C-alpha cells in the first residue's frame, strides 16, 4: 500500500494542467452502451474508477482500447445485460449501466453498489424514475432486475436534486418512446457534458444545465467522438494549494465559470484570482481571512470542495463556520486535521474552524477521496514532515497529483509502506 511523504512550507509556483473530469467520464463511458458503434473519448484521466468502468464495459461485451488519454470503445459486441457484484461493489456509479442496458435489450440485471442502503441513498430515485417509464423492477439477492419491452416517456419530478439520477434517466430516455421531462433535475456541468455526448449521438435533449430537462426519444443512436470537460474539482484543489501555501501558480485547461461559488469564497478569503486567455492565475494571500461556507447543489458551493476549503480555513486569521448540506458523515477528515494542530469543533452538519498560526506535520490517514486531498493540502502548508497513508482513495479521483504538485515545487513523494 502506498503513502505520500510531504515536507511542507514551500510556496507553490509554476504552471499545472488540469486533467479531464472523472465525474463526466464515467457516465459518458456508460452512455456508449446505448449506441452499438465505435466511439472515441479523449481527455480521459488515468484513474482507478475509469479502469473499473472499462472492466464493467468489457464484462458486458464491449471492446475497449486506451492510448494515452484517448479511449476507443466498441459497443457493437455488447451481448450481456448483467453487471456483477464483483465489479459494481467497487464503484457506486456502476449502477448507471442499468438504464442503458434496459433501453438496449429490454432487460437488465445489475448488482446494487456495495454498502448501498436503498432508503439512505438516492438510488431509489433512479429506480422510481425507470418504473415511471414502464420498467418492471424487482430486487432479488442484492441485484436489481428490470424488464421493459420499450421504455416510454414520462414526467419525473425528483424529490431531491440527484446528479446520478438525472444522468441515469437522461440516458434511459434517449431512446424511449415519446417525451420524458425531468423536473428538479441536477444542474451540474457534468450533466451538460453528458447531454452534449448524447446529442452528438443523435439524441434530442433540451434544458441540460437547468432544473427542467426534456428528452424526445429517438429510434437509435450512433457513434460519437468527444473531448471530456476539465475536472473542476481537481482545478479547485490546485487553487487552494496555491492559496494555502501563499504561492503563485497558473492553472491551465480549466473552466473557471464552473467554479464561481468557490472563486467568490476564495476571493473573500483574500486570494487573488486572474483569468486571462483561459489560464487562471492564483496568488495566495499574506493573511487568510475566515470565511463561512454552506455546501449546496450546483451552482452552490460544491460538497466535493468542502474538505479542501476546511484545510485552508485552519490557517485563517479568524473563525469560520462550514455547513455540509449534501452528504452525511462528511466530516471524517476533521479528526485528522486536528492531528496537525487544527482547532475544529463539530455539531451535526456544522464545523466551526478557529484559525491557528501554523500547522505541524503529522502522520495522518485518508478516509475518502476528498479527505485525501484535504490532508495533502494541510501537509503542504505544515511545518516539518507529513505522512498520508491509505491514499488508494486519492487514486480514484486525482491523476498523478503528487507529480503535478512536485512540478509546482512541492516536496512530495509516493512510497510503498
From Swiss-Prot:
Q: What class of enzyme is it?
A: transferase
Q: Binding of phosphoenolpyruvate: at which residues? A: 22-23
Per UniProt, where does UDP-N-acetyl-alpha-D-glucosamine bind?
A: 92, 304, 326
InterPro entries found in the cross-reference section: Enolpyruvate_Tfrase_dom (IPR001986), Enolpyruvate_Tfrase_sf (IPR036968), MurA_subfamily (IPR050068), RNA3'P_cycl/enolpyr_Trfase_a/b (IPR013792), UDP_GlcNAc_COvinyl_MurA (IPR005750)
Keyword Ribonucleoprotein attached: no
TM region(s), chain numbering = none
Q: Which GO terms describe its biological process?
A: cell division; cell wall organization; peptidoglycan biosynthetic process; regulation of cell shape; UDP-N-acetylgalactosamine biosynthetic process
- Which pathway does it take part in? Cell wall biogenesis; peptidoglycan biosynthesis
Q: What is its EC number?
A: 2.5.1.7
Which reaction(s) are listed as its catalytic activity? Answer: phosphoenolpyruvate + UDP-N-acetyl-alpha-D-glucosamine = UDP-N-acetyl-3-O-(1-carboxyvinyl)-alpha-D-glucosamine + phosphate
One Pfam family this sequence matches = EPSP_synthase
Task: List UniProt keywords, sorted A-Z.
Answer: Cell cycle, Cell division, Cell shape, Cell wall biogenesis/degradation, Cytoplasm, Peptidoglycan synthesis, Pyruvate, Transferase
The cellular location(s) given in this protein's UniProt record come to: Cytoplasm
Q: Name one GO cellular component term.
A: cytoplasm
Instruction: Kindly list the positions at which 2-(S-cysteinyl)pyruvic acid O-phosphothioketal occurs in this protein.
Output: 116
Q: Where is the major localization of this protein?
A: cytoplasm
Kindly give the CDD domains that the UniProt entry links to this protein. Answer: UdpNAET (cd01555)
Q: Where is the active site?
A: 116 (proton donor)
* Family listed: Belongs to the EPSP synthase family. MurA subfamily.
Extract the PANTHER family matched here. Answer: UDP-N-ACETYLGLUCOSAMINE 1-CARBOXYVINYLTRANSFERASE
Which NCBIfam families has this protein been placed in? murA, PRK09369.1
What protein name does the entry list?
UDP-N-acetylglucosamine 1-carboxyvinyltransferase
Protein encoded by which gene = murA
Amino acid at each position: 500500500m502506498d503513502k505520500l511523504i510531504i515536507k511542507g512550507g514551500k510556496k507553490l509556483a509554476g504552471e499545472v494542467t488540469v486533467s479531464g473530469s472523472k465525474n463526466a467520464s464515467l457516465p459518458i463511458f456508460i452512455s456508449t452502451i446505448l449506441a452499438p458503434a465505435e466511439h472515441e473519448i479523449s481527455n480521459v484521466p488515468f484513474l482507478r474508477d475509469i479502469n473499473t468502468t472499462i472492466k464493467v464495459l468489457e464484462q458486458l461485451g464491449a471492446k475497449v482500447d486506451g492510448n494515452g488519454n484517448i479511449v476507443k470503445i466498441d459497443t457493437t459486441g455488447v451481448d450481456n445485460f448483467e453487471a456483477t457484484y464483483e465489479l459494481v461493489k467497487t464503484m457506486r456509479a456502476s449502477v448507471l449501466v442499468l438504464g442503458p442496458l434496459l433501453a438496449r435489450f429490454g432487460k437488465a440485471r445489475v448488482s446494487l453498489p456495495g454498502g448501498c442502503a436503498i432508503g439512505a441513498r438516492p438510488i431509489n430515485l433512479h429506480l422510481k424514475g425507470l418504473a415511471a417509464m414502464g420498467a418492471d423492477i424487482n430486487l432479488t439477492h442484492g441485484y436489481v432486475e428490470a424488464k421493459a419491452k420499450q421504455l416510454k416517456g414520462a414526467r419525473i419530478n425528483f424529490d431531491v436534486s440527484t446528479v446520478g439520477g438525472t444522468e441515469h434517466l437522461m440516458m434511459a430516455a434517449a431512446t424511449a418512446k415519446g417525451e420524458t421531462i425531468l423536473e428538479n433535475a441536477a444542474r451540474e456541468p457534468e450533466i451538460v457534458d453528458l447531454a452534449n455526448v448524447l446529442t452528438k449521438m443523435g439524441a434530442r435533449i433540451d434544458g441540460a444545465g437547468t432544473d427542467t430537462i426534456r428528452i424526445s426519444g429517438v429510434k437509435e443512436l450512433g457513434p460519437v467522438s468527444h473531448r471530456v470537460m476539465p475536472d473542476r474539482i481537481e482545478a479547485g484543489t490546485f487553487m487552494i494549494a496555491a492559496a494555502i501555501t501563499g504561492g503563485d501558480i497558473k492553472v491551465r485547461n480549466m473552466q473557471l465559470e464552473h467554479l464561481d461559488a468557490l472563486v467568490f469564497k476564495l476571493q473573500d478569503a483574500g486570494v487573488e484570482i486572474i483569468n486571462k486567455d483561459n489560464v487562471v492565475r492564483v496568488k495566495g494571500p499574506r493573511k487568510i481571512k475566515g470565511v463561512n461556507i454552506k455546501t449546496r447543489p450546483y451552482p452552490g458551493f460544491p460538497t466535493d470542495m468542502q474538505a479542501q476549503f476546511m484545510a485552508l480555513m485552519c490557517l485563517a486569521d479568524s473563525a469560520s463556520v462550514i455547513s455540509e448540506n449534501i452528504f452525511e458523515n462528511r466530516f471524517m477528515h476533521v479528526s485528522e486535521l486536528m492531528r496537525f494542530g487544527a482547532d475544529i469543533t463539530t455539531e451535526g452538519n456544522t464545523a466551526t474552524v478557529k484559525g491557528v498560526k501554523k500547522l505541524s506535520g503529522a502522520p495522518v490517514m485518508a478516509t475518502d477521496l476528498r479527505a485525501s486531498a484535504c490532508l495533502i493540502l494541510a501537509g503542504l502548508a505544515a511545518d516539518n514532515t507529513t505522512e498520508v497513508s491509505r491514499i488508494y482513495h486519492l487514486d480514484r479521483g486525482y491523476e498523478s497529483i503528487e507529480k503535478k504538485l512536485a512540478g509546482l515545487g512541492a516536496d512530495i513523494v509516493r512510497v510503498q509502506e
